[in-house]
Regions:
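A short SAM/SAH-binding and catalytic strip from SAM-dependent methyltransferases
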Residues: 104-116
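Conserved class I S-adenosyl-L-methionine
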Residues: 1-37, 51-55, 73
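A short glycine-rich, Lys/Arg-flanked "PGG" loop and its adjoining helix->strand segment in the class I
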Residues: 118-133
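Local beta-strand N-terminus motif with an aromatic residue
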Residues: 39, 86, 102-103
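A short acidic, Gly/Pro-enriched loop at the edge of an enzyme's catalytic core
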Residues: 95-105
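Conserved catalytic/acceptor-binding region of the Class I
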Residues: 133-182
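Class I SAM-dependent methyltransferase SAM/SAH-binding core
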Residues: 43-97
Length: 182
């Protein structure tokens, strides 16, 4: 991720929810992959305005770290939902930050913005305790093809195939338990 991405998300934070229909659908789908017995300590990468955060806050956890590159996105989230005392905000680029050890890392529609997803997965793995979990969703190469075609634009994000993501996961030393393609 870079400063341009942060600036764009910050600039449009106040209207993000009106335009994030797909991200909200993805958040609902991703919530179905959360474990029955929720881990105690969770890190959400790219919490944004809280589309997936709301699902995490419905679960019994002891500590949740909410990260986003845009402080304005987090401000919008705080206006929508009260954050519990066991939550902690971490503003900054997840590719560059150091995090505490956690039991689970989540990310909804975020990893496509990483400059180097493979390296980022490796780094994030180092913050997951043994037997911990990484639960994430991302866009693929066919995501929004009609819209991109009509607008005549290429995606500013890295849109990798399922096979590429599977390879990144394996190369990072993670084990893929479940994968779903829409």
């Amino acid at each position: 991720m870079n400063i341009r991405i942060e600036l764009n998300f910050s600039k449009y934070a106040h209207v993000y929810d009106k335009n994030a229909t797909l991200q909200n659908v993805m958040a609902g789908e991703l919530s179905s992959f959360l474990p029955q017995n929720m881990p105690k300590k969770i890190l959400e990468i790219g919490c944004g305005t809280g589309a997936f955060t709301k699902y995490l806050l419905d679960k019994p956890v002891q500590k949740i770290f909410l990260n986003d590159i845009s402080e304005k996105m987090i401000e919008c989230m705080k206006l929508k939902m009260p954050l519990p005392p066991y939550s902690q905000i971490i503003v900054g680029n997840a590719e560059l930050l150091n995090f505490q050890m956690v039991d689970m890392i989540t990310a909804n529609a975020v990893f496509q913005w990483f400059k180097d997803p493979k390296d980022s997965l490796r780094r994030l793995k180092s913050y997951i305790r043994p037997n911990g979990i990484l639960v994430f969703s991302t866009f693929g190469p066919s995501s929004l093809t009609e819209l991109r075609g009509i607008a005549g634009i290429n995606s500013p994000a890295a849109l990798f195939s399922d096979n590429e993501w599977h390879n990144f996961i394996e190369e990072a030393g993670l084990t893929l338990n479940t994968s779903k393609k829409n």
